[in-house]
Amino acid sequence: MAAPALSGDQIRETFLKFFEGKGHRRLPSASLIPEDPTVLLTIAGMLPFKPIFLGQQVAEVPRATTSQKCIRTNDIENVGRTARHHTFFEMLGNFSFGDYFKKEAIAFAWELVTEVFQVPAERLAVSVFEEDDEAFAIWRDQIGVPEARIQRLGAKDNFWASGPTGPCGPCSEIYYDFHPELGNDGLDLEDDSRFIEVYNLVFMQYNRDAAGNLTALEKQNIDTGMGLERMAQVLQGVPNNYETDLIFPIIQAVAAIAQRDYASESESVKVSLKVIGDHLRAVTHLIADGVTASNLGRGYVLRRLIRRVVRHGRLIGIDRPFTAEIAETAIALMAAQYPNLREREAAIKAELTREEQRFLETLERGEKLLAELLAAATDQIRGEDAFVLYDTYGFPLELTQEIAEEKGLTVDLAGFEAAMAAQRQRSQAAHETIDLTVQGSLDRLAEQIHPSEFVGYGDAVATAKVTALLREGQSVEAAEAGDRVQIVLDHTPFYAESGGQVGDRGVLTGESLIVRIEDVQKESGFFVHYGQIERGLLQVGDSVTAQIDRACRRRAQANHTATHLLQAALKLIVDEGISQAGSLVAFDRLRFDFNCPRAVTPEELRQIEDQINQWIAEAHGTVVEVMPIATAKAKGAVAMFGEKYGAEVRVIDVPGVSMELCGGTHVANTAEIGLFKIISEAGVASGVRRIEAVAGPAVLEYLNVRDAVVRDLSDRFKAKPEELSDRVTALQEELKANQKQLTALKAELAIAKSDALVSQAIPVGDAQVLVETLTGVDAAALQTAAERLQQKLGDAGAVVLGSSPEEGKVTLVAAFGPAIIAKGLKAGQFIGGIAKICGGGGGGRPNLAQAGGRDASKLPEAIAAALDQLKTAIAS
């Protein structure tokens, strides 16, 4: 008897309720951005509990159960190609912290799978660690699994460890058998065509020391994981995870946009649809948890996934932005379990739209270059060329590798790394963000040094010890004058970039030592000071004096507090429901992105500016307090989305004006800001607006620049500043009149040229066909000429004209008479097809249509094709 079909949501809820009934506390999924500084993303259900398993933290409850969202990209090349590989997945888990152990964990698992989910026992097989006789006996003697259905596997598959030392233990797994009729002879649980692992039980019972010796733990723990998508495949009786109700609605939405029928498509099209369905789930959750696309760290993972989605969309014929539209389906599917998706919907769509548009701007040119490289390569794409695709066109290296592999080629990785290193050497600017090389080095150092202590809220100068030194991202013991370095101090007054505020600048000094610090980033708990040694030798262990640039700090403080005032003013004047979508607090300017469905009016901007300057003039003191997060929320403090908060939070309060959770630096009194001036307001994505502004000394600098521009224009136009507006209006009217006259002259020229072309029409049956190229004729004139020619040729006239009015651009126009249309030819469809030859497209009405292209060298080919196709169509 088959197990009853359950929806993905029902499977999740059934699992969690089952373990609640077994005394487990249901806990919410943790963020994809882990607390563990050594891990880039949450990759397993146990990760939020790792400090408990490692003995670093005491568990609040003895038993817990969760549905944890996870992301893994180590098998990304298999996504869509196998039945069960994903980047995003949900891991259902039950955990015991020193409470029950092996016997109970196995019994719970078997009861859930066979009695609650009603999976027939004959469909199941289990594995145990080859030396775990206890687990083997429990499965055989207490659960009743036939010995032939229990397989012993080695440490590679069935022994878990957190690292070379520390807690570890054997695993046991439950497998679903798609073909039990094949019997038990030669049973191979690693045969993916027959078995799928659905439940993994980890028994943490040992501690491994540096010598590799195992000793029993005083408190034994249980960590389990059931893949929701895998169990859905089993219970829903579908051939793969992608066709479950957790993912397939997304695939169907993509197929609808691409005008594809999933069931009847080729395997390659299905792979692309599956990749998009999988990746859209991943990127939606990443953005919801505060990740933004970049070339580094988590941002790089997000960018890589979005760009794979866009490329696979193009492979199946989607030639327009579509990710935000599909995100709506993904959000609707998952919002009940993850309500932050709905709360962050506007930000998700905005980030997807922004990143997709950025990639599309260079994708076509990059694809053209890549096509040329693929055609020229015999077995390998040069590393330098792969780097150009990465650096200039935004192609992640992995994407180039994937496309190359489809053509049976490889990429020269060593050459790519060499080109990357050469580019780093050419760049003289400080790193603006931490890169993966630095992060990897810090991860390796994490076990040897303590995280940095920040003392910069109260001190601008501090004596500190150099605990780590990196050059080009690699750990070194010493560096000398001229070297660009990354420095970790035991404590520091330098603020590290976070919450939108840029890192401090300043200097490190010592005996005969000067290091100019240009930027500070925080990663893995360390404050990383980016700079260049101007004089002397710097070594790990040195004592240095760390001093921030006070002027830069004061400017950042003014801009940061001004940003808080700006959000308060927006809520007061525009809409109380406005929420922050992003920000930048630099030394010379500030930027604030916010969720709002409409533009802020000029009058509202004036009111906002006036209100902020009034608060500045009123000299409100700022109050900084550290309090429990629950207390802060109860007081109405606004949280910045994407920031991670602990049990205790820092609150910046401008009494009666603004209260926000914030780790940044701020003025002690609003009067220190001086002045505030809005520079611009614009939309950056659907539902997201951006205000750019200046505060403090930057206002005077901005006004001085404006004044210089006005003076220059006054001199050029021989007009007083107050007369400039009228003078510019008059010039615009004059230009408009001249352009109108020029258009008329071009039309007259086109008509004259068209009159001369009438005699060149050729008869095709009872029709008159004219296909020609005109030089120096723009789109409007070309259309006028085509219409006139068709009228002269009569109802049976068919005209196609082409021109290249600008370098690299093509314009094509078709004009068909009623008799031509009656033969089934439509100008819009016809000219759109011809334009593809020139790398473009277009369309219009059946009698008159226009198209464009980007490859002028193909215009003669397009004109010839138009004539051939017209002859064939009319003659038939």
UniProtKB/Swiss-Prot annotation:
Cell compartments where the protein resides: Cytoplasm
Domain of life: Bacteria
Reactions mediated catalytically: tRNA(Ala) + L-alanine + ATP = L-alanyl-tRNA(Ala) + AMP + diphosphate
Binding positions for Zn(2+) per the UniProt entry: H560, H564, C662, H666
Enzyme type, top EC level: ligase
Cofactor dependency: Zn(2+)
Gene Ontology CC entries for this record: cytosol
Any one biological process term the GO annotation gives: alanyl-tRNA aminoacylation
Matching Pfam families: DHHA1, tRNA-synt_2c, tRNA_SAD
Cofactor binding notes: Binds 1 zinc ion per subunit.
Main location: cytoplasm
Entry GO MF terms: alanine-tRNA ligase activity; aminoacyl-tRNA deacylase activity; ATP binding; tRNA binding; zinc ion binding
Gene3D superfamilies reported in the protein's UniProt record: 2.40.30.130, 3.10.310.40, 3.30.54.20, 6.10.250.550, Bira Bifunctional Protein, Domain 2, Threonyl-trna Synthetase, Chain A, domain 2
Keywords, comma-separated and alphabetical: Aminoacyl-tRNA synthetase, ATP-binding, Cytoplasm, Ligase, Metal-binding, Nucleotide-binding, Protein biosynthesis, RNA-binding, tRNA-binding, Zinc
Family (UniProt): Belongs to the class-II aminoacyl-tRNA synthetase family.
Free-text comment on this protein's domains from its UniProt entry: Consists of three domains; the N-terminal catalytic domain, the editing domain and the C-terminal C-Ala domain. The editing domain removes incorrectly charged amino acids, while the C-Ala domain, along with tRNA(Ala), serves as a bridge to cooperatively bring together the editing and aminoacylation centers thus stimulating deacylation of misacylated tRNAs.
Described purpose of this protein according to its UniProt entry: Catalyzes the attachment of alanine to tRNA(Ala) in a two-step reaction: alanine is first activated by ATP to form Ala-AMP and then transferred to the acceptor end of tRNA(Ala). Also edits incorrectly charged Ser-tRNA(Ala) and Gly-tRNA(Ala) via its editing domain.
The protein's name: Alanine--tRNA ligase
Organism: Synechococcus sp. (strain ATCC 27144 / PCC 6301 / SAUG 1402/1) (Anacystis nidulans)
